[in-house]
Amino acid sequence: MLKWFIISCCLLTAISYSTYYLFTSNSWIKTVKTHTYSRFYQLIKENTKTQLDRLQEEAKLSGKSLIPPFINFDREYAIAPKYNISICRIKKSMSTLMSGVACVLYDTGKFMRNNRSILEVWSHRFCGEKNEYRRMNEVKWRMGDAHHTFKKIVVIRDPIARFISFFSNKCIFEAQKYPDRKQCYNCQGNVTCFLEKQYERFVQHSSDYSRIRPSYEDKHAAPLSWNCEFGKFLKDYKIIKLAVDPKDRKNGLANLMNVLKESNVPNSTLRFIEKSALEGETMHATYDSDAHDVVKKEIENDKKIREWLKRIYYLDFVIFDFDTTFINS
């Protein structure tokens, strides 16, 4: 009897110790947390995919198919390893400004000594290709030991505002300046003509068997979700919504400053970036031009144009949580 009592006590002690170790082990807790967070984000991803699939199916049934999201189409990264930051630049989404921000963070002293601007023309940008990469894998390699923890930042803007800026700059200003290029499919400033042709090109690009080369127009007009390898890394990004007009830029810029501050960017550098961004504008800014106002008014007054824009950009509104009131009007 005594023998069985001693054996039972030993077993209970062993079980108690094992249970205590299991629930207090940091590695075990870390594994559970990782699994829980991973599953949480997976559920969000699955729910979002279901919603996007449903919207696409409804549009298809109505004969107005939407351009699908998350095509791995265009990628431009500028990095600042000192602060473990990578900035993805999206064309016509303050890409010139963000290129300048990445550059001043890359080598602040040299940037300041040379009296450079974060808004300088793209072709004369100070850092050039010194801190620029085309693939996230290249960025991870360059980040070295920080490749698991570096911060991914991207600036986006309302898809319709972005389109108006693109069309005013590329399909009116540049098309008139360089007529021999027959830019924007030679539509001569006709918004409907351009959207019809661009929609068909995006349909081809989204095909698994597409062999057409991305054009200048494709890259500038592509849906937001086709950039930055969002299909793989969307949940990892710090997403900043930033308006182009300096009067409306303050809130988004404050968010950007907070994100940079989290990465220990000095206050003096933050003040320089904020002051430059609020007081200046890039060479390609169109928000206060006559062409911008004409295109904006045309979109507001023409339901057919809004329908084409919806077919191309509607899922951007959903994915990045922009107000859909206007696009649905």
Swiss-Prot record:
The gene is chst-1. Disruption phenotype: The tm576 deletion mutant is lethal. The ok625 deletion mutant has reduced levels of 4-O-sulfated disaccharides, but increased levels of 6-O-sulfated disaccharides. Increased mortality in response to oxidative stress. It comes from the Eukaryota. GO terms for biological process: chondroitin sulfate proteoglycan biosynthetic process; positive regulation of response to oxidative stress. Belongs to the sulfotransferase 2 family. Keywords: Carbohydrate metabolism, Golgi apparatus, Membrane, Signal-anchor, Transferase, Transmembrane, Transmembrane helix. Catalyzes the transfer of sulfate to position 4 of non-reducing N-acetylgalactosamine (GalNAc) residue of chondroitin. Highly expressed in the head and tail of hermaphrodites, in particular in amphid and phasmid sheath cells. This is Carbohydrate sulfotransferase chst-1. Residues 24-329 are lumenal. Disulfide bonds: none annotated. The chain crosses the membrane at residues 4-23. It comes from Caenorhabditis elegans.
